[in-house]
Amino acid sequence: MRRMQTFGRTIAAAAVAAAAFGLTACGSKDSETAASATTTVAASSAPAGPTATESKGRECVAEDIGVTGGFGQAPTITIPDDCDPPSTLITKDLVPGSGPGATAGKQLTMNYSLVTWSDKQKLDSSFDRGEPFRLTLGAGMVIPGWEQGLEGVQQGARRLLIIPPDLGYGAGGNGVKPNETLVFVTDAVEVPQG
């Protein structure tokens, strides 16, 4: 008997959750009842605040990302909560460089720090290891967001790269969450001058 009562309560709870989901998925903005029911269920079963899939109404731009520290120093990267990750590659030189810009086939020496968008935490940093990263631009050694985002970078530049999932690690993740937006601050330590 006790098992049947527990089973009955479980089924009833599942029915309430399914109904709330149906209201959320299919309800209109004009339905105060649907909004009220959804809010009540959400408030009792989930933490307050927007979810990762809830749109904030606009995509972030480079100026929304906070970066402290100068060229050669490990940066602190701050991702805001009030905008969505960009759907296209964004690059911005935070510190200008000098000399010729990087082109395909050139070997670059870069320092970088990576923060993942979803959890706003540093995932990797050559600054922390004390050794810059070397790559040949256009040789397929790095993710497409780096290949495209470092094109034209000049020696001495600090460049922000906001890389959407399709130019990063995509659905496979490869050490990050699937479909993760990546935020890099890169320092062009060496760009060939000739």
Which residues are covered by each model-predicted region?
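Cross-family detector of peptidyl-prolyl cis-trans isomerase
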Residues: 2-194
